[in-house]
């Protein structure tokens, strides 16, 4: 598998996680919507599914790991940043085969693509603190 397939899976997953967070829809419905309505050419679909399902099922545990490293309440983190750090938190905690530098760099790129101007700095700082715990 090409690394770009995983990058595309992360990109799609962060959008699906964002949608799931805001809609509160069943994660299976969100997954189905994204698989059927988005362009999934070149996407590692199995990895996309794992990321979405993993974050949905473990988000409370991931949030608890992130909270001590925040400079604000978790509820005050923007939905986009929340989706990104939850995805990265999942990879850092539950996917030991993914090097931490890769998980952090991918999250930074997602923040640059989807977040506000300084989102990538927030994401980088938070995840760096998480891996140093």
Swiss-Prot record:
Pfam families: NusB. Keywords: RNA-binding, Transcription, Transcription antitermination, Transcription regulation. One of its GO terms (biological process) is transcription antitermination. One of its GO terms (cellular component) is cytosol. GO terms for molecular function: RNA binding. PANTHER family: ANTITERMINATION NUSB DOMAIN-CONTAINING PROTEIN (PTHR11078:SF3), N UTILIZATION SUBSTANCE PROTEIN B-RELATED (PTHR11078). Belongs to the NusB family. Involved in transcription antitermination. Required for transcription of ribosomal RNA (rRNA) genes. Binds specifically to the boxA antiterminator sequence of the ribosomal RNA (rrn) operons. This is Transcription antitermination protein NusB. It comes from Shewanella denitrificans (strain OS217 / ATCC BAA-1090 / DSM 15013).
């Amino acid at each position: 598998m090409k690394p770009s397939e995983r990058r595309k899976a992360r990109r799609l997953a962060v959008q699906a996680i964002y949608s799931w967070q805001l809609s509160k829809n069943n994660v299976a419905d969100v997954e189905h919507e994204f698989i059927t309505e988005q362009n999934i050419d070149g996407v590692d679909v199995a990895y996309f599914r794992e990321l979405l399902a993993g974050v949905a099922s473990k988000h409370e545990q991931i949030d608890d790991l992130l909270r001590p490293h925040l400079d604000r309440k978790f509820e005050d983190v923007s939905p986009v940043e929340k989706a990104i750090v939850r995805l990265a938190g999942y990879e850092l905690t539950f996917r030991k085969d993914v090097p931490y530098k890769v998980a952090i760099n991918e999250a930074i790129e997602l923040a640059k693509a989807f977040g506000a101007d300084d989102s990538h700095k927030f994401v980088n700082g938070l995840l760096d603190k998480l891996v140093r715990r």
